[in-house]
Amino acid sequence: VLSDQGALFEPCSTQDIACLSRATQQFLEKACRGVPEYDIRPIDPLIISSLDVAAYDDIGLIFHFKNLNITGLKNQKISDFRMDTTRKSVLLKTQADLNVVADVVIELSKQSKSFAGVMNIQASIIGGAKYSYDLQDDSKGVKHFEVGQETISCESIGEPAVNLNPELADALLKDPDTTHYRKDYEAHRVSIRQRSLCKIVELCYVDVVHNIRAVAKILPSTAFFTDVN
């Protein structure tokens, strides 16, 4: 599939966001499950084995996630794309509706208490990546993009919807320490949820940029853009 450039990408002007969105969607549909022989990682579903998030230090709230299963990245849409051909830098932002399911241990470190269960998060996000690039000739004189180190950003659109399995929700509801902290938690709930979600998203977008880097090694620069040389 990847040897057929026309099937993988539609070359676009760097100014044509509609074309870039179509081309990105085409690539994601082809490669979202990963292509190991080209070092393209699966991103939908994207699996993260474990992640610890210090969610709110004031009450010692820590989320210990395991077996995170993230879906929705294959349907991400470009919301912003800026390419500076003089400085050879790219700003890419995409919007996606994500669904996250994970085993979780919710720790209240100040009380030495933990509660285990399953968490489901649903949210709309904007993930961003800034990276440098260069154009390099391969052994046959064909130009390829070489993608530099990325800086990842994340924005949660509104408040993420969070659901816990009934046993975990019931345990948190009845525990005296969680009852004591509930008012403080509720006052900061939106920012806690957004910050925790973005820690997950940032790991996801490392793989998204990795795949951009990987496919740039396979295809010539002309497979991506009509106005970069």
Curated annotation (Swiss-Prot):
The keyword Ligase does not apply. One of its GO terms (cellular component) is extracellular region. Its main location: secreted. Keywords: Secreted, Signal. InterPro entries: Haemolymph_juvenile_hormone-bd (IPR010562), To_sf (IPR038606). Prevents juvenile hormone from being hydrolyzed by general esterases by combining with it specifically. This is Juvenile hormone-binding protein. The lineage of its organism: Eukaryota, Metazoa, Ecdysozoa, Arthropoda, Hexapoda. The gene is JHBP.
